[in-house]
Amino acid sequence: MNSGPACATADILVAPPPELRRSEPSSLLIRLLPVVMSVATVGVMVTVFLPGSPATRHPTFLAFPMMMLVSLVVTAVTGRGRRHVSGIHNDRVDYLGYLSVLRTSVTQTAAAQHVSLNWTHPDPATLWTLIGGPRMWERRPGAADFCRIRVGVGSAPLATRLVVGQLPPAQRADPVTRAALRCFLAAHATIADAPIAIPLRVGGPIAIDGDPTKVRGLLRAMICQLAVWHSPEELLIAGVVSDRNRAHWDWLKWLPHNQHPNACDALGPAPMVYSTLAEMQNALAATVLAHVVAIVDTAERGNGAITGVITIEVGARRDGAPPVVRCAGEVTALACPDQLEPQDALVCARRLAAHRVGHSGRTFIRGSGWAELVGIGDVAAFDPSTLWRNVNQHDRLRVPIGVTPDGTAVQLDIKEAAEQGMGPHGLCVGATGSGKSELLRTIALGMMARNSPEVLNLLLVDFKGGATFLDLAGAPHVAAVITNLAEEAPLVARMQDALAGEMSRRQQLLRMAGHLVSVTAYQRARQTGAQLPCLPILFIVVDEFSELLSQHPEFVDVFLAIGRVGRSLGMHLLLASQRLDEGRLRGLETHLSYRMCLKTWSASESRNVLGTQDAYQLPNTPGAGLLQTGTGELIRFQTAFVSGPLRRASPSAVHPVAPPSVRPFTTHAAAPVTAGPVGGTAEVPTPTVLHAVLDRLVGHGPAAHQVWLPPLDEPPMLGALLRDAEPAQAELAVPIGIVDRPFEQSRVPLTIDLSGAAGNVAVVGAPQTGKSTALRTLIMALAATHDAGRVQFYCLDFGGGALAQVDELPHVGAVAGRAQPQLASRMLAELESAVRFREAFFRDHGIDSVARYRQLRAKSAAESFADIFLVIDGWASLRQEFAALEESIVALAAQGLSFGVHVALSAARWAEIRPSLRDQIGSRIELRLADPADSELDRRQAQRVPVDRPGRGLSRDGMHMVIALPDLDGVALRRRSGDPVAPPIPLLPARVDYDSVVARAGDELGAHILLGLEERRGQPVAVDFGRHPHLLVLGDNECGKTAALRTLCREIVRTHTAARAQLLIVDFRHTLLDVIESEHMSGYVSSPAALGAKLSSLVDLLQARMPAPDVSQAQLRARSWWSGPDIYVVVDDYDLVAVSSGNPLMVLLEYLPHARDLGLHLVVARRSGGAARALFEPVLASLRDLGCRALLMSGRPDEGALFGSSRPMPLPPGRGILVTGAGDEQLVQVAWSPPP
């Protein structure tokens, strides 16, 4: 409610009257003075009566001592009493003066209380003057004055209670001052002729006894108060009257409170005047109302309380007696009850009849709708173009926002003061429920209805993400509707950039137009015929700006910049909030030239906005507000309502219109409404004024310049991105996403150019941020813009298997997962081979760069090869599981770009990529990082990349971007590509038959011992025992070690006669039984004892072959000083032969260094488990020191490097790595020779 004139309520402490003074004892000096004077008098008398003194001669001299004696006695007797009486008198004078001053203060308080009470409860005869004003319907449920009604005037306690301090005891009290205090309290503890109010509460019936005429006069006064102070949405007034008394209450029919909320008759809402209480109860049974007041003027009396109804009865008849109020057993006599004549009550009711309550609780006068205020009239026939053409310069940017209490339209003009406006910037503050959102919608809709999009654009911002502006997004005037900034902090920085970019854009347009000083001059230049683009005023409305500045204080700098230059740039601000904290504006208040304030939470908030507390005193009615212009003038207004239903006449063609008829308007219910003809169409919902006007605006005027483009919430589709992209300027430049540039108010394709130094790519982001998708998008984009003869891909998928989805592309040669280590290794080998081949090709053909080669390739297809991309998804996993490949990849990244070989990888952190590789990566795509502080692009911007938005990240220049989704069809690309396909990676078969390998090898290998097929070229591979006499085979169980020995044995037999080769097979597990059945068998040993005997004979043979001193150099060169077969000692399961008790093969140790000259060959197979330790055993250590060849078959990698840098790895049976020298390794599949 409106608080009205202030009235003090604090208690007044009245000082108690003084006590009577006690007689005070004299001081010692005063008590001794009479004694001294007496002695002095006696001395004088003695002197006088001495013989020869003058007194003896003249008796007149005796008068002097006698006078001294008398004066002394009188002074001693009377001096003390005189002082006591004088003190009491002074106390009385002081206290009576105090009461006189206090009387003046109390009188002023009483006068202020009179004013306040009469403002709160005015004379009922004056109520009609308040109708239509700000105080009408001000009392709301829950307020202290709700249903508190004046019933008359009389004595009332003083608002400031007079509290007397502790009184002195009765025997010590001063009777004069005590009597004065008693009279003061009796005169001022109450005030006379004060309005007396009683609360009306649901409970037992209230009865008013007395003279019926006076009782009805009091009831009329009470009902008019209820109707003026309370809204019909919150309180209804019913009447239960007999037919004899109905004429006294006929005026009730005019009250909007007396109209039934649901029931209707032929005249509209049914009046709530009934004949009996039961009839009223039945009529109100279906209504859900907080309060109903029923006037009962019948012979019937209520037997108790009626649920939800306050009943006031005309009680017992007492002719000539004043009314007496009876309620709940209490009786209140009224000395001077209020009276309201019937004609005065009728005037009050009929004035209230013109008022209703809108859907938001806002009061309005019939006929004062928004359309009428704006000048539209019938919204259905509204032609925006016509209205815009008729708007003159004065009405430009000027819009009605509501009406004053007397119905005058209130205009908001956001033009600057130089153009007789209120702007350019303003403030709007209103508490929750005050109608602030409706006011903002009203302003926005009015601005659009009265101004063309060429004149005005709107940027609507709602920090909290409410629905204030959502319906306005489709209007041609709206540059953007920005919501939900509170939950999306990065969008606040984006809006800051967008507003700064708009200021920069407008400044640039003014410069290009001839360094114009303002938008006003720019528009005048356009009107005079200058060919300039449209530059409308931008009206920026920011709701909940206080919350925005609270969470993002730096945003005030943007508002300050607009406040300083917005006038010249045509950017107008309207800042709205529920509350305005002192100091929050930080200098912005100097730029706010007009202010609108609705109901505020406190008086201090109202003072912060307007400089007065008037906004706090506004009624709780939504939409009630004050407008303060730059001159300080305050204009009270009620906001127009645009969210209500559109009022429009029914089409005359639907049903014939009945002729008008005259019906009596009484308190009796008219005939019920009869249903019209049943049509064949369903009821069409009534649109709101807002939506109806927005529908009429569609298609009129140019669309507003998009200051705010939609955020990167949804990733684009790659297909659409490629269709819209401009032709690439470089050979390998493709768009893979969208970059958001809010300052430039644009979104541009994220184009990655891989044709030069930026040919290597790294995609870095936290888990589930879209790294794999980004690599797929890159592959798809290149595949869609290049055929398989120009770009090819080989993928290592160590992520979640996403790259397997591109395997169907013709551009993809192979996709290897973590379960395919051989394919991964083979892929690297092929790419390394490609680099070496291209290096030689460039050198032979005088090509100085890969760019030059691409130019030549475009002219001639001869000797063309594609750009090859090694795509690695999951760099950390590759380093962990296939560490041997890392160095090859780093070398490939360093050397490959010069020959058209690229590396693209994904990682979770930049730290996972070693500097040696990171330095080779020129194209860096950074998605959301787990720790934004790890960003290598922009740490501050990295913090703003949203979480749980796969594909969102930063471009190389620190701008926000989103990767496109790869929506292309690989099968369709394969059909479109035609014949060119990426060559697959040749892989070794799981099994190679020995006979087929022998047939394939033919006679090319000569006497070399055939082992199987090598991976690189798929050709047979052999072991040259002539150059390297020994071979070590290592592997786990079931890996094919014995099969490899079986193949070697049979191959030795096949390629050598028995005279040239003999085999000594050491087979403690009997796995090589019957492998050799020819004369090549020197011996088969299956036990340590037998082995010792055989080796003894062998040692004798070897000792005999040692060159004698007389052997010539020619004999040594031709190895002709001895004759006989080479001896092949084939040892299976060497770990069973070399045991802790001894190693029989130790006898051969001294001959191993001379084995090639002596015709000795040692072929040893051993488990790889514990091989790292076993290689220090003397025989094996000697073999390794002599550089023997090794075949590393399947084993555990944790054994470490066994030969050079080679370490075991899981391999299929029969497959192994043949180590033929330092760093020379090749993967082979051992030819399968079945056991006998």
Curated annotation (Swiss-Prot):
Transmembrane regions: 32-52, 59-79
SMART domains referenced in this protein's UniProt entry, alphabetically: AAA
InterPro entries: AAA+_ATPase, EccCa-like_Actinobacteria, EccCb-like_Actinobacteria, FtsK/SpoIIIE/SftA, FtsK_dom, P-loop_NTPase
This protein's GO CC annotations: plasma membrane
Any one GO molecular-function label of the UniProt entry: ATP binding
FtsK domain span: 407-607, 747-936, 1018-1201
Localization terms from the record: Cell membrane
PROSITE patterns referenced in this protein's UniProt entry, alphabetically: FTSK (PS50901)
Record Pfam families: FtsK_SpoIIIE (PF01580)
Taxonomic superkingdom: Bacteria
Oligomer and partners: Part of the ESX-4 / type VII secretion system (T7SS), which is composed of cytosolic and membrane components.
PANTHER family registered for this protein in UniProt: SPORULATION PROTEIN RELATED, TYPE VII SECRETION SYSTEM PROTEIN ESSC
Name of the molecule in the record: ESX-4 secretion system protein EccC4
Source organism: Mycobacterium tuberculosis (strain ATCC 25618 / H37Rv)
Protein's gene: eccC4
